[in-house]
């Protein structure tokens, strides 16, 4: 099974990529949508270029895609890139930080990836999953969402148990202050987060 992983650089897409590898599948590339607009219903906005470093560390190509973030258009922009109609050079330049050194082994995917399926790290967003599923139908490939509706605590514990280095990159909920920024999610911090999640009623896994 040859797959592309939709990678935002976040914990869930990283876990989805690991899941595919553990199944013995060939990860042909990581695909990252960089939003040039102010908002997106589909894709993560901040820090997505880190996915290029993840691709380099995995030894797989990276396919950067630009999107204006407009509702209903953004999934079509991703689909167009997966069909091989993508200015990968421009997408790389606009996605990459000038302050970063490009890894020597980072390979930029050119053209359409030869895949049987697309793997995504969607947890609970019907909006996102439905649109990815429909896109995959149009492309003639299978859509896999291995984390779909996983229980929050179990999912976070699995990340810690399997050695993922998860860092909190932003906070936008009551109960979480700037002291959490950059903090690693481990057994201790996860227990603290779980208590705060109960009190302030946010999702432990960061969804929504």
Predicted segments, located by residue:
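ATP-dependent adenylation/nucleotidyltransferase module used to activate substrates
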Residues: 1-169
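A conserved mid-domain beta-alpha-beta active-site/ligand-binding segment of alpha/beta enzyme cores
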Residues: 170-208
């Amino acid at each position: 099974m040859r797959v592309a992983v939709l990678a935002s650089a976040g914990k869930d897409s990283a876990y989805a990529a690991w899941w595919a590898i553990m199944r013995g599948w060939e990860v042909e590339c990581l695909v990252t949508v960089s939003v040039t607009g102010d908002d997106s219903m589909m894709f993560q906005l901040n820090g997505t270029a880190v996915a290029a470093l993840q691709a380099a560390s995995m030894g797989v190509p990276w396919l950067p895609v630009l999107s204006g973030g407009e509702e209903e258009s953004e999934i079509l922009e991703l689909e167009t890139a997966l069909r091989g109609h993508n200015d990968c050079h421009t997408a790389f330049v606009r996605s990459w930080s000038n302050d970063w050194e490009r890894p020597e082994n980072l390979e930029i995917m050119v053209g359409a990836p030869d895949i049987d399926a697309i793997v995504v790290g969607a947890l609970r967003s019907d909006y996102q999953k439905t649109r990815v599923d429909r896109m995959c139908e149009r492309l003639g490939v299978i859509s896999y969402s291995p984390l779909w509706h996983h229980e929050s605590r179990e999912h976070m514990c699995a990340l810690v148990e399997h050695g993922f280095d998860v860092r909190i990159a932003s906070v936008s909920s009551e109960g979480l202050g700037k002291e959490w920024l950059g903090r690693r999610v481990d057994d201790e911090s996860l227990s603290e987060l779980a208590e705060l999640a109960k009190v302030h009623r946010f999702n432990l896994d960061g969804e929504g």
